[in-house]
């Protein structure tokens, strides 16, 4: 489980080493909201390719070990420590065409969100993009919770697949 104090510590590991991180997933949503709205089993972080290996070195020094899963790739790795805190780490690159992640190109504005975790101001996926990345798959109760809070807070139309049937 990754609570606010854990998320702050993980983020500070990057910032203290001049590595900028961008939040996604549940913590990305909660950063936009400025509060912890639910329990998180992990923290999703995006790190630029030029800092990816450096950040891995840093988190290893803080006791995180890589876990191999069926969805890990060279640019998407999972890290866990003895306190059962999990970092879902993604590597991306800024290009003239936008943000390149796993061969896909996203608009440069995707990381234009600004939020807060504890007392740390963080960059994250903007609210509309957060809602959009929650589409097209079978969502769970956390997805429902996150999307509904984003739509309510930022006056975004609730997507059809999230409307009560």
For each feature predicted by the language model, list its residue ranges:
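Helical scaffold of the NTase/Pol beta-like nucleotidyltransferase catalytic core
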Residues: 1-23, 148, 155-165
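Active-site nucleotide-donor binding segment shared across nucleotidyl transfer reactions
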Residues: 11-43, 48-49, 54, 126
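Short, solvent-exposed loop/turn segments at secondary-structure junctions
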Residues: 28-29, 94-95, 129-131
């Amino acid at each position: 489980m990754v609570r606010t104090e854990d998320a702050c510590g993980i983020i500070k590991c990057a910032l203290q080493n001049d590595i900028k991180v961008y939040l996604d997933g549940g913590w990305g949503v909660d950063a936009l909201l400025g509060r912890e709205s639910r329990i998180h089993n992990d923290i999703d972080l995006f790190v630029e390719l030029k800092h990816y290996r450096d950040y891995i070195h840093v988190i290893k020094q803080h006791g995180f070990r890589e876990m191999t899963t069926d969805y890990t790739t060279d640019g998407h790795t999972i890290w866990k420590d003895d306190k059962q805190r999990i970092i879902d780490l993604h590597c991306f690159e800024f290009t003239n065409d936008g943000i390149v992640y796993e061969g896909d190109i996203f608009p440069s504005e995707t990381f234009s969100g600004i939020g807060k975790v504890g007392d740390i101001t963080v960059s994250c996926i903007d609210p509309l993009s957060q809602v959009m990345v929650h589409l097209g798959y079978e969502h769970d109760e956390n997805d429902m919770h996150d999307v509904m809070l984003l739509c309510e807070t930022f006056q975004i139309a609730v997507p059809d697949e999230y409307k009560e049937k």
